[in-house]
Amino acid sequence: MDHQITTASDFTTTSIPSLYQLDTLLRCHICKDFLKVPVLTPCGHTFCSLCIRTHLNNQPNCPLCLFEFRESLLRSEFLVSEIIQSYTSLRSSLLDALRIPKPTPVPENEEVPGPENSSWIELISESESDSVNAADDDLQIVATSERKLAKRSMTDILPLSSKPSKRNFAMFRSERIKKKSKPNEQMAQCPICQQFYPLKALEKTHLDECLTLQSLGKKPKISTTFPTESNPHNKSSSRFKVRTPEVDKSSCGETSHVDKYLNSMMSAEHQRLPKINFTSMTQSQIKQKLSSLGLSTNGTRQNMIKRYNHYEMLWNSNFCDSLEPVDEAELKRQLLSWDVSHNKTPQNSSNKGGISKLMIMKSNGKSSSYRKLLENFKNDKFNRKGWMVMFRKDFARLIREAKMKIKTGSSDSSGSVGHSNDGDGVEKVQSDQGTEDQQMEKDQDTVINEDRVAGERNLPNEDSTDADLSRELMDLNEYSKDPPGNN
């Protein structure tokens, strides 16, 4: 069902405009909508659970009386919750029943009935009724028009306002009612079902039916009979008997709300999420906390803190205050929707050494292609080949730096092994170390010169392909497995 925006002023045009106050009292002072999961503050005011928790994050006081209190002092109001749900379910029907109907304008050409143009009931005359009563006692009402009324004499027409005689009033009786209420028929009470039946019907059929049903363990059939003059007790009891319609508890909304309130209790299945002081936590600890709850760890430190704080409000409002909590998947869906609209990561964040800074640095001179690649950077349509061509020089430089680090690590490990030998071995290791240092200096000079030459070109080499870059990566992998220092 679609959610419709309603206001308390809808009742001002009804026959009971004072219901405007009731409708206003059942609304939250913060969101102006009907209370959802209402909670009670220590100062006695009621708000939506999520609304007041969000307000307390900014200002630790009541929005109405400014009384200061903590979030842990909020208490659930199950009764108010069911009252509001019951009221909202019948609000539209109540409005329809209380709306004052607008007077419909009467057309000018339409005649308004007056005393001279009132409706008439035509009754048959005494001579005609004698012949009709022999066959049927039913009342004959004949629809008459103005032409037929003109032909008839006024003595044969009786106005509706006139009082009929005893003989005419007797004509209103139905023949079916006469058959069922014969005054001379003797009635008797069944000793099994305690119901009154005609004596002949009781002796012939009813007693056998009651005895048969009683032997089978079934309840006897109770048939309704018309009261007769021979059974005054039955007549008086049926006159004052009031039919009370049975209430279907499954279809009546009020009954279900009452049952939910009577069976309400605090659920111990989910524990309350605590407030966390993030000032003493590192960024890795914050990520670990979010990962334990199944939340995203993207964004800056401040983004992750805001994400946890909002999820804590959703969790406690749902599992600690609501009678009908939703599952965790729905809470995470609500968090994702909030994260997209309220917790955006700034595009111009300068993370030192990060991929965003590198992408901005390399976008000079090729901004159009860079922006085109950046549009699909985080989905399956990302052009990897174009990305490798754009940043080919950086990949090559990183590969060379990795090779140099592998050489440095292998020389350090061989030097530590050589220290365990005698003095000659130490001198040999030191000479080898000096040779390696000289070689590293030469390699670094070579890398610097290559970077300088590549910077002067300012364009990637068109002859190199993705296969060349892949071969360099494979060579680096083999080089890391079997470095030259191990030979």
UniProtKB/Swiss-Prot annotation:
Q: Where in the cell is it found?
A: Nucleus
**Feature: compositional bias, Basic and acidic residues:** 243-254, 421-430, 439-455, 468-481
Q: Which Pfam families match?
A: SAP, zf-C3HC4_2
Zn finger (RING-type) ranges are 28-66
| Composition bias, Polar residues | 222-235
Task: Supply the EC number(s).
Answer: 2.3.2.27
Domain SAP positions: 278-312
Q: Which GO-annotated molecular functions does the record name?
A: single-stranded DNA binding; ubiquitin protein ligase activity; zinc ion binding
Any one biological process term the GO annotation gives = protein monoubiquitination
Where are the annotated segments for Disordered? 222-254, 407-487
GO CC terms, sorted:
chromatin; nucleus; Rad6-Rad18 complex
Glycyl lysine isopeptide (Lys-Gly) (interchain with G-Cter in ubiquitin), cross-linked positions = 204
User: Where is the sequence biased in composition, kind Low complexity?
Assistant: 409-420
Identify the pathway: Protein modification; protein ubiquitination
The misc remark on file is:
Present with 206 molecules/cell in log phase SD medium.
Q: What family does the entry list? A: Belongs to the RAD18 family.
- How does it associate, per the subunit comment? Homodimer. Interacts with E2 UBC2, forming a complex with ubiquitin ligase activity. The UBC2-RAD18 complex interacts itself with the UBC13-MMS2 ubiquitin ligase complex through direct interactions of both RAD18 and UBC13 with RAD5. Also interacts with UBC9. Binds single strand DNA.
What job does this protein perform? Answer: E3 RING-finger protein, member of the UBC2/RAD6 epistasis group. Associates to the E2 ubiquitin conjugating enzyme UBC2/RAD6 to form the UBC2-RAD18 ubiquitin ligase complex involved in postreplicative repair (PRR) of damaged DNA. The UBC2-RAD18 complex cooperates with RAD5 and the UBC13-MMS2 dimer to attach mono-ubiquitin chains on 'Lys-164' of POL30, which is necessary for PRR. The UBC2-RAD18 complex is also involved in prevention of spontaneous mutations caused by 7,8-dihydro-8-oxoguanine.
Q: Entry's PANTHER family?
A: E3 UBIQUITIN-PROTEIN LIGASE RAD18
The identity of this protein, by name, is Postreplication repair E3 ubiquitin-protein ligase RAD18
**Which organism is this protein's natural source?**
Saccharomyces cerevisiae (strain ATCC 204508 / S288c) (Baker's yeast)
Q: What gene does this protein come from? A: RAD18
